């Protein structure tokens, strides 16, 4: 169980899975609090995805609750950098390593939270519930961009 607006990523994953419309080589995971273990496995794997899209609810100064935006790994708020570390290696470090050392493009789609309650509370705030479709659109746009880039590469391969 996640804390209120911290359930934003799983809510987006659930809607994308229900909506469908992505190619067979795309996997949509509700990683919940297990994201570090998954990223660690990918870092150690010989076969890696071309792109990872992370969706999360964040608290970033100057943003309005419910605002959906893309953020660089380097610009993640301090309170998210060390979330639930795995062997003292924060998630952001794993994402950076996947990007810089493993050649995996990492995209972070975020929404400004209204608040994260201090205790377990089910459900998103109204602002974040309303942001789910916008985040889904951004993720689907990223997937479409990847697919068109693959088609362009394949289309150009046979031309001299």
Regions found by a protein language model. Give the residues of each.
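N-terminal catalytic or cofactor-binding beta/alpha core of small enzyme domains
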Residues: 1-104, 108-113, 122-133, 140-160
């Amino acid at each position: 169980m996640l804390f209120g607006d911290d359930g934003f990523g799983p809510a987006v994953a659930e809607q994308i899975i229900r909506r469908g419309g992505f190619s067979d080589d795309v996997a949509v995971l509700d990683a919940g609090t297990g994201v570090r273990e998954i990223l660690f496995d990918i870092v150690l794997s010989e076969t890696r995805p071309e792109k990872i899209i992370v969706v999360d609810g964040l608290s970033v100064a100057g943003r309005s609750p419910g605002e959906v935006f893309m953020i660089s790994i380097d610009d993640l708020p301090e309170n998210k950098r060390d979330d639930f570390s795995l062997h003292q290696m924060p998630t952001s470090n794993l994402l950076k390593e996947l990007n810089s050392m493993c050649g995996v493009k990492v995209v972070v789609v975020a929404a400004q939270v209204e608040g994260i309650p201090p205790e377990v509370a089910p459900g998103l705030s109204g602002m974040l519930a309303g942001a789910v479709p916008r985040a889904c659109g951004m993720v689907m746009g990223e997937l479409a961009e990847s697919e068109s880039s693959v088609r362009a590469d394949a289309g150009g391969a046979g031309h001299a």
